[in-house]
Regions:
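Nucleotide-sugar donor-binding/catalytic module of glycosyltransferases
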Residues: 1-105
Length: 105
């Protein structure tokens, strides 16, 4: 089944906030999405936290690059996306559980 939505999360040293962000995305009532986590050269445990989540959920893909900034991290995610519809969530944000269900309603 093709995913209708690609959610891109650019990350840089987000170990304090990334778990709450990921939980809010993975807890969506709408589940037909891929989750692209773009590690922008984090020097903390951000990547390890994301790898643990990726082992548990096949919708997650991790992309990594040297630290190039938010815009280039988002662009890397967009270029890797397989869906026509793209959504962005920053690594220090979280979203309502029905956000994407409402978007596709």
């Amino acid at each position: 089944m093709n995913k209708e939505l690609s959610i891109i999360v650019p990350m840089y040293n987000a170990e304090r906030t990334i778990e709450k962000c990921l939980q809010s995305i993975l807890g969506q009532t709408y589940s037909n999405f891929e989750l692209l986590l773009v590690n922008d050269g984090s020097e903390d445990k951000t990547l390890q936290i994301c790898e643990a989540y990726a082992k548990k959920d096949k919708r997650i893909r991790i992309l990594s690059q040297e630290n190039k900034g938010l815009i280039k991290a988002r662009k890397l995610g967009v270029n890797a996306a397989t869906s026509a519809v793209v959504g962005f969530v920053d690594s220090d944000d979280w979203i309502d559980a029905d956000m994407y269900e409402r978007m596709f309603a």
